[in-house]
Each structure stands twice: as structure tokens, then as C-alpha cells.
Amino acid sequence: MKGKTMIDRKEDNQFHLVSKYEPSGDQPQAIETLVDNIKGGEKAQILKGATGTGKTYTMSQVIQRVNKPTLVIAHNKTLAGQLYGEFKEFFPDNAVEYFVSYYDYYQPEAYVPSSDTYIEKDSSVNDEIDKLRHSATSALLERNDVIVVASVSCIYGLGSPKEYADSAVSLRPGQEISRDKLLNDLVDIQFERNDIDFQRGKFRVRGDVVEIFPASRDENAFRVEFFGDEIDRICEIESLTGRNLGEVEHLVLFPATHFMTNEEHMEEAIKNIMEEMEVQVNQFEAEGKLIEAQRIRQRTEYDVEMLREMGYTNGIENYSRHMDGRKEGEPPFTLLDFFPEDFLIMIDESHMTMGQIKGMYNGDQARKKMLVDYGFRLPSALDNRPLRREEFESHVHQIVYVSATPGDYEMEQTETVVEQIIRPTGLLDPEVEVRPTMGQMDDLLGEINARTEKGERVFVTTLTKKMAEDLTDYLKEMGVKVKYMHSDIKTLERTEIIRDLRLGVFDVLIGINLLREGIDVPEVSLVAILDADKEGFLRNERGLIQTIGRAARNSDGHVIMYADKITESMQKAMDETARRREIQMAYNKEHGITPQTIKKEIRDLISITKTNEAEVAEDTVNYSAMNKKERQEAIKKLQKQMHEAAELLDFELAAQIRDMVLELKSMD
């Protein structure tokens, strides 16, 4: 973060990687080259790592060696969750943080003129993710050894890091401050007093003792004990039991919201909001749009009244330009502004992620412009937005794009491509062959039977939903245990299907897009690509290389493309696979390595998910029949399950259990 703050930032913390592995294959040269280039000041480079070569481990080694705060961006929440789990295992002693959109459900504010329908913003904020977002921003302001794993939501407006840091309340034993002054300070930074329901972002008061629950935690809180108008001592406590966990020499409490502004700035912001409203009202009236003029006046005056009274209003982010003191068109503050100037960015699956970063701005502006044109929002709401790609680029000090198939954009940014082709397991890229489409069903059935007899699994990728369904029906008739995975299947269900495939509940998985995250199955020895010669997103060079990679985790990996001609994309994908395979075979021969299928533990699919969903449903039925004591027991049990789900990053289930807890509490 740029600018001075009152926080003692620990600059000398070192990253410490914990792993039972040593770099092997071509990981050592990849790590060495990336590190040397970063230390030599190179701005951008690409880590072009084949599937299964241990790219995350290489990234971790680089982070440890360059020792800079690092932002890792993934293209969706699920992938970000997987990376967060891996980095947390590699760096147990450092701050590994998770920053994704905190909406479980999010319907953005919108207006549809054709049907005169205004859709109000409707969202449910996931409390666990909100905690993790606060944990990320506070860690960045307090220490140097921080890795933040984020989705593309990190380029959305977040509020000024300077206001956030300057609003922080700093407390030490011996400090002269009255209890009432502390209570006022806490309310100013959006903490709520609640002496009964003690949770994140709240505080309670008992005589000369104030207990405070920071927004970035969900288990331990802090107890501040006063002697007169002086802090006597500060202790960390267990929030549920109140048990003392030890004394604290310094406590920094960051605001309970990222959108902070001081009183002086608030007055200035309100003045500017009202001026902008008058201009907009006059413009609407001049155009004869009296409904729009009345609408924008009514809405703005209500919001301003809330800001004056509470310091906050729903949709406060739409006034962020005024709150931050930005000029029209200036980019908003984002998570990137919370980092120090010299930080490292790593873009995972960059061929997907960079496309997302490019597309965010236009989609956001189109929706908001409609709200402005019809008097639901002031024009300044257009400046509460994601960064444009060039604005994102201006934040880049040093960046590493990570992908098996880097996109054109990344290749234009740098000529430095560091390859990682050798797998630690000695596994080779699979053999690829092309077969004609005539008689492909019978041919495929024969191949499937040959694989399933050996206890191996098969992926089949089609181009259309109809073909996938027809093929599934045909294979079922032929006695094959098969499932079709379509795009409507939710993330959790997808994980369950993959687990069942690995366990042998069924043998063949058919899908249109088998490049989705988490679909890495070592038991798959055959990937069949139907209509391989139909050019398009999933049949271009990158799509084919990624699909071929799905067979690269098995020592008998084989790929069959069914096609009547060999397209340029097919040829390039086959040439690249053959090139890698040759390098891998030469390495194995030189080092006497025999390829070994990856031994990947089949984790008990978020073990609490199925049983708990059943239990939760059962509890729901019995709520009304419970007495008070039974309900208290049920609440404790559910809260434990909720924390377990959250720790496993199963936020959907955690939110579901949280709703059950709230329902139970409301019965008392």
C-alpha cells in the first residue's frame, strides 16, 4: 500500500516452504531461471508447464526465494480454493490468504427497459469469505510474508487502503484512553455493540472490560481491561468460552468494512453527491424525463440521509468515487492497492484468467449505464467498477503467467518463456493417434472394454449435448457403466462425480468440456476426442493440448482423435505433444526412470457434505419439536459442522448450515 500508516509493518519476515519433496525433473532449472529473472528486474515471464509437472510447487519455490508479497490470481473460486489449500500446506508459518467474491448468491442491480423492470441488488454475503477477505487486507498492512490467492474479483473496487489503514484502532497496555472513547472509536469503524450475540465485527461491554471480535477472525477475540482511563492489559480469548489464551502487547483493529471514510471526507462526499444529483435532476427535467428526475432525487436523498446518520448505506460502493475523492474516470482502489509497490503477481491458467480480466469492465459498464439512464443511479456509479486491463497492467511490478498453453496476450507481453516439461513421476505425454469417424462408435466401445477390463477409466469428449446424451444411452445399452457430465452440474456435484469415477462406481465419463478445474484423474488411461476436426474453442490447438493432458497422469495414457481430416490445430497439438514426449523419454532414459502412474489419494469427498446435508434436513424437520436445551445442543453441533465445512472451503454447505443455526436461534 502506498502512503504512510500508523501500523508497525513487519518487513523482515521470511517465507518458509515446508515440503517432503525436493525439486526434480526440470523444476530446478525452471525455479532458477524464474528467480534470476525476477531478481534481475525482468517485468514479465511465462512458466509454460505441462499438466502434472508440479507448477504449484515451482511457484512456491519461487515465492520463497524472491521473498516478496505475492498475489496469485485464478479464474474461478474453485480453482482459487484448490490453490489456497496447496499454498497453505507449503507455507504453514506464513500468511496465506484467500480473496474471492463474498456473495453466495448475487443478483446485481439492473433495469430492463423493455418490461420496465427494476431488479434490486439481492445478495447473501458468505460470512466465512468476508472474514477471509478482511484477513487478507489486514495481513497485507501488517506483514511482508503474505500470499493472497484471489479470483478475478480482486480487480473490483474495494475502498481506499489509506482510509482503511488510517481508521485502524491501535491499542497497547499502559495507553491512556477512556473506555467510552474506545467504544466511540469502535462504532466509528463500523463495529456493532452486542452484549449477547458476540461474533465477528462486534464488541461487548462488562464494566471496565471491553471484549472485541475482529472482522478478520471467527474463533478468538480480544479482551481489553481498563484501570480508570488507562488500558491495564489486553488478552486474546476464546470467543465461546472466554478462556484466556495469553496477553498481547499490541492490538490493531481494522475497520469492519472496507469502505471507510473519515468525517471530513464524508461531509465533502455528501456535498459532491448532492451537487451531482442536482445536475442530473436538471438534465432529466430538461429532457422531459420527470419520472427519472423524481426517482434519482428520492433515492439519492434517502442514501445521503443514511450516510449522515449511520456513516453507511446499502450500495455505498456506488458513491465510492466521491468517498475516495477520485476524479471522473479514475480507476477505483482495489486489492492491488493494498500491496506494497514491490510485489509479485502470478496468473494461474493465464490463457483463461487474462481473458476474464479483459472482459470484466465492458460487461459491468453496460449494466450500470442502464441504471444511470433511467434514474436509478448517479453517473458517478459508473466509476464503481472493475479495472480495465491497461489499469491492471499499470499495477504490475513483476508478473509470471502460468499455463500449459499460454494465450496470445501473454506471448505478446514477453519473450521469456520458461518451460517445465519433465514430470517428477517420469510420466510421458500420451501417445496420440487419429482414427476415421466411420464406425467410431463400435471402435470406441472396443477400446472402452479393453480399458475397463484392466480396471482403468475413460474420458470421452463430444461437441454437442445431443451427441453426449446419445452416446451415453448407446454405451448403457451395451452394458458400460457410464455417466454424462453436463454444464448445469454444480461444482460440488462435479467433485462427487469425479470421485465416483475414481472409485470405479462407473468407468466412462462423457462431457463436452472436460477442461473444467479439478478433473485430474490418474485412473484415466484413455481420452477419446470425437469430432476432433471441427475447429472451435474446444478443438483449437490450446483446447486439444489441454484435453490431451487429461491422459498424462497414467503410465498407459493414450489419446484417440476421431476425425476425417487433420486440421492445422490437430497437427500443432500432436506436434507439441510429440516434442514433449521425446524430451521426457530422453530424460527418463538418461536417469533410468520408469514412468509411474500418479498415486493420488481419493479424499473422502468433503466428508461432512453428504451426511451433514442429510442431518441438516433431519434437524429441520425436528426443530419445532425440540425443547430449548435440545435446540442449544443442536446449535453447538451445527456450528461445529459449519466451521468444518468452511475450513474445507465448502462455503455453500457452510452457508446452508449457518441458515439452520439462525433459524434455531430465532425460536428462543
From Swiss-Prot:
| GO molecular function terms listed in the Swiss-Prot or TrEMBL record | ATP binding; ATP hydrolysis activity; DNA binding; excinuclease ABC activity; helicase activity
- Return the similarity comment: Belongs to the UvrB family.
- What Gene3D superfamilies does the annotation carry? P-loop containing nucleotide triphosphate hydrolases, UVR domain
> What is the purpose of this protein?
The UvrABC repair system catalyzes the recognition and processing of DNA lesions. A damage recognition complex composed of 2 UvrA and 2 UvrB subunits scans DNA for abnormalities. Upon binding of the UvrA(2)B(2) complex to a putative damaged site, the DNA wraps around one UvrB monomer. DNA wrap is dependent on ATP binding by UvrB and probably causes local melting of the DNA helix, facilitating insertion of UvrB beta-hairpin between the DNA strands. Then UvrB probes one DNA strand for the presence of a lesion.
Q: In the UniProt record, does the keyword Hydrolase occur?
A: yes
Where is ATP bound in this sequence?
Answer: 49-56
One Gene Ontology biological process: nucleotide-excision repair
Name used for this protein in its record? UvrABC system protein B
Q: What is known of its domains?
A: The beta-hairpin motif is involved in DNA binding.
| Annotated ranges, domain Helicase ATP-binding | 36-276
List GO terms (cellular component aspect).
cytoplasm; excinuclease repair complex
- The UniProt entry annotates the motif Beta-hairpin at 102-125
What does the record list as coiled-coil region(s)? none
How does this protein assemble? Forms a heterotetramer with UvrA during the search for lesions. Interacts with UvrC in an incision complex.
Q: Name one Pfam family in it.
A: Helicase_C
User: Where does the UVR domain start and stop, copy by copy?
Assistant: 632-667
Q: Which domain of life is it from?
A: Bacteria
